[in-house]
Design a protein with these regions (language model features):
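Histidine-acidic metal/acid-base catalytic patches
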Residues: 1-4, 9, 13-27, 100, ...
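Active-site beta-loop-alpha junctions enriched in small/polar residues
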Residues: 6-10, 34-38, 66-69, 109-111, ...
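Active-site acidic/histidine proton-transfer and metal-coordination neighborhood
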Residues: 14-17, 55-56, 74-176
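Residue-level detector of anion-binding/catalytic polar loops
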Residues: 29-30, 60, 102, 144, ...
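Conserved beta-strand positions in the central sheet of alpha/beta enzyme cores
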Residues: 32, 63, 105, 146, ...
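Glycine-rich, proline-tolerant flexible connector loops at the mouths of alpha/beta enzymes
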Residues: 32-55, 111-115
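Surface-exposed, active-site-proximal loop segments in enzymatic domains
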Residues: 41-45, 68-87, 109-123, 218-226, ...
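Catalytic-core regions built around general acid/base machinery
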Residues: 46-58, 130-137, 195-198, 237-241
Length: 287
């Protein structure tokens, strides 16, 4: 497996330009670029400059993060490119195909009320419909879609089994998974990752690795993520399960922790690398 850095870790204290330099220095193999930080880059730089960086450095781009689906999206045969989600998708495809990034993270619909109370089967069917359309739009760009289950109660796709049903129903070779250790844990404190063994292994396009604080259910959220090595997520079991499945791809550290955002980007990226590398080495997952 290869080490990767997701820009969410230093979102509020860094820039894409800084992240590129610091990730190269730290030793990361890949970087996951955030769309908001990509737009920040494009204010003063060009896509060709980003392409040139990756052509002349060891660090390479992986998935672009992220496009958020919503119920009723893409109602017509042709996409509405004024739709903010489709603008994100188009930017990810345009830039990704230019710089050598072949993946975009896709997040299922999240209920703005905080709790999904709809019909689960209908919601899964809607995800299948949207993903099928996005797969067609992505194909000319050579992009693959990494569908990410979210274990929070506001999500309509909370489990590995649900995500697997959707990806199998889509049945497109450019639609697969990104498995995120904390998003799996968020579904009823799940530290049993054995369901990953039941998915099509070739469909695991990306992996996100992190742990999280031990807090009451009412306080659980993405801001409680922390680097591997402490916390309540059994990251060892997660990595060992992926290894059993034959996964050898990238493992990207992704946190949304305000405490980290108050640090320097140097501190964040150095610690992100050391903890991720240590976790992979401990579980004999390094290539």
């Amino acid at each position: 497996m290869k080490t990767s850095y997701n820009e969410a870790c230093s979102r509020d204290c860094s820039t894409l330009e800084q992240d590129l330099s610091l990730c190269e220095k730290a030793g990361f193999d890949y970087i996951e670029i955030r769309l908001d930080m990509l737009r920040g880059w494009l204010k003063d730089h060009t896509v060709d400059q980003l392409k040139e960086f990756f052509e002349t450095h060891r660090l390479k781009p992986h998935a672009i993060n992220a496009v958020y689906l919503r119920q009723g999206m893409l109602p017509d045969e042709m996409p509405d490119w004024n739709d903010p989600a489709m603008q994100d998708f188009k930017l990810a495809c345009d830039v990704g195909s230019t710089i050598g990034s072949s993946y975009v993270i896709i997040v299922p619909p999240l209920d703005p009320s905080g709790v999904f109370t709809g019909d689960t089967a209908a919601a899964e069917k809607e995800c299948v419909r949207i993903l099928k359309k996005l797969a067609v739009f992505a194909r000319p760009f050579g992009m693959k879609l990494c569908f990410e289950l979210v274990g929070l109660r506001k999500s309509c796709v909370r489990s590995i089994e649900a995500a697997d049903r959707i990806v199998r129903a889509v049945d497109e070779d450019n639609v697969g998974f990104v498995f995120d250790s904390y998003n799996i844990y968020l579904n009823d404190h799940c530290n049993d990752f054995s369901a990953i063994k039941t998915v099509q292994p070739e469909k695991i396009f990306a992996v996100h690795l992190m742990s999280a604080d031990d807090v009451p259910d009412s306080e659980m959220g993405q801001d409680k993520r922390c680097f591997s090595g402490s916390g309540v997520v059994d990251t060892d079991r997660f990595l060992k399960t992926l290894k059993i499945c034959g996964y050898t791809g990238m493992v990207s550290v992704e946190t949304f922790r305000p405490e980290y955002w108050s640090k320097t980007p140097e501190w964040v990226i150095e610690n992100a690398y050391s903890t991720t590398y240590t976790a992979l080495k401990k579980n004999q997952c390094l290539e």
